[in-house]
């Protein structure tokens, strides 16, 4: 047997072994992979017949039951919580950190971590069953600050969504390859373009290789019609250590997608989600106070950046819709400079129309533009402004209701300050759809 024949036979034997192993793997996979259909019973009421093999969150979404998810089902936000009272196996290590011992005993799970392999009985919030998905049309998408857009979409004709101010929506993000150079510069605006050019923003590119979803708080309140209105901050890569340019990593997937959209574009949105709502008193009353003679607690909102969204919705609903005039209300908002503050005119007008409402602006540093415009502000971080200008001399800060949404460091500083003032945790409400409320 010559050398050529030996080589050919060796290759043939090798390929035969590889093909045999592949066939065995496919056979084993076919035997081990679950097949067929199972039943999912929801709240002892609704029963679904579904195929096996997918995660619970995706299986339910295919049946138009939408669990909340701010991370696209990656197990990092902890929002897709539900009780799996039958089936589903034991809780996974990836889930444990999101629940207390009592919740684990009560069978709480993350929908993105539960595989549908057998019949399941689950319990979800009733509000989840009211969530719908809509194909919406972009109405406007203009910058309201250097790196923040007001993104507004219209629900389809004939559709209506009931929601409580402070709720959030989810947007479906498709696969894409987006170059920031293709962004519509008119939608960014001449006021903000110099900063974009200074930081070489138009050199960035974002690639998304698989569909996902992201969550954003709604800035609109019900009286503004059948729309979703979000405030979205572009998530840039971190700077290199020498601050010469951005690191070569992907910018934010969802914010890049939203910033690329133009009026007339179609997007898939679902909602409403969330429990960041104004506390109810006296059988559902949030204000005005009832005729019992007892005033409802004072309210303080504190926000920064795109965290403006749910706070605006709550404040506008209480004032413009419910006409609450006998609850003391204060809104503390922090920004780097005056040109980063949006909806300012709305809140200054509220101060004129509602003597019980007060807007407090905190800017990081003295701002000549604010001084020239005659806009009242205090130069400091927002938690310091809250304490120094109001809470320090307040007779009972522990009785106030606090509503908070903004960057993590801001929230942590505010919580620490309120904790030192003796404010109980139940009086501090967070917009926490992104996972992880501030800790002390």
Label for each model-derived stretch:
Residues 2-73, 84-105, 276, 320, ...:
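Reductase modules of NAD(P)H-dependent flavoproteins
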Residues 139-265, 289, 336, 363-366:
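Ferredoxin-reductase
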Residues 127-136, 207-214, 341:
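Short coil-to-beta-strand transition motifs
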Residues 257, 271-295, 392:
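A short, basic/flexible loop-to-alpha-helix module at the beginning of a structural domain
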Residues 69-78, 111-115:
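Cysteine-centered iron-sulfur cluster-binding motifs in ferredoxin-type domains/subunits
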Residues 116, 128, 175-178, 271-276:
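Short, charged beta-turn/beta-strand-edge "cap" motif at the junction between a beta-strand
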Residues 21-27, 31, 97-154, 159:
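Fe-S ferredoxin-like electron-transfer domains
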